């Protein structure tokens, strides 16, 4: 059993879903970023989804682009990110840790080397935002060689063939998009996703987590009621970081209570 299957089994036994926050590592600074992750875990996060800062994030709206800019300005590099993950893993040995990043960062030092480094740091899964399932073979092979779960996006308008492929290649969880477009809490999650969820179930896909535009507890409740195994919230977390980055005590209190409210909705 890996950390994801353990986490989902534990949640299922308690009739709960997963709350998964996303943050960009190093935003607004390295020490602050580690404190933010502690606050989210203390608030009840079941898994973490972590981004490496990147200068040209295609799928991200302005909020997460701002996080990338702040993290890069703080001197965050991929090497820094792996060192941070080692610290997070040492502190939370059972917590599933996923990476959400772009192919350029994986290619930079060679695909195999990237996954080896990720495994050594304690990473459980990798989602490459700009590599569709159809083009993922070298990434999947490198991930599986290291025992890392390759994660795939299931878009709301996907064909049955795409969903079948996502289900067969993916491990850990399935990233279910609530809508097409760029990320952002202002672009509220759109339901219904019943047809996508039932297709994923039919194809035995890993547990679906709904992402994109998840900003409030009611949306978490809706996602789980629709059949998702949980929800991922990124822009809503990063918005709070942006607003309160100059008042860390207030920010950490706010993030912990946000995570608690989102978790309570599962």
From Swiss-Prot:
It is an enzyme of class 4 (lyase). Tetramer of two alpha and two beta chains. One of its GO terms (cellular component) is cytosol. It catalyses: (1S,2R)-1-C-(indol-3-yl)glycerol 3-phosphate + L-serine = D-glyceraldehyde 3-phosphate + L-tryptophan + H2O. SUPFAM superfamilies: Ribulose-phoshate binding barrel. Its EC number is 4.2.1.20. The gene is trpA. Signal peptide: none annotated. GO terms for molecular function: tryptophan synthase activity. The active site is at residues 49, 60. This is Tryptophan synthase alpha chain. The lineage of its organism: Bacteria, Pseudomonadati, Pseudomonadota, Gammaproteobacteria, Alteromonadales. Keywords: Amino-acid biosynthesis, Aromatic amino acid biosynthesis, Lyase, Tryptophan biosynthesis. Pathway: Amino-acid biosynthesis; L-tryptophan biosynthesis; L-tryptophan from chorismate: step 5/5. It comes from the Bacteria. Belongs to the TrpA family. The keyword Flavoprotein does not apply. InterPro entries: Aldolase_TIM, RibuloseP-bd_barrel, Trp_synthase_alpha_AS, Trp_synthase_suA. The alpha subunit is responsible for the aldol cleavage of indoleglycerol phosphate to indole and glyceraldehyde 3-phosphate. The keyword Isomerase does not apply. It holds the Pfam family Trp_syntA.
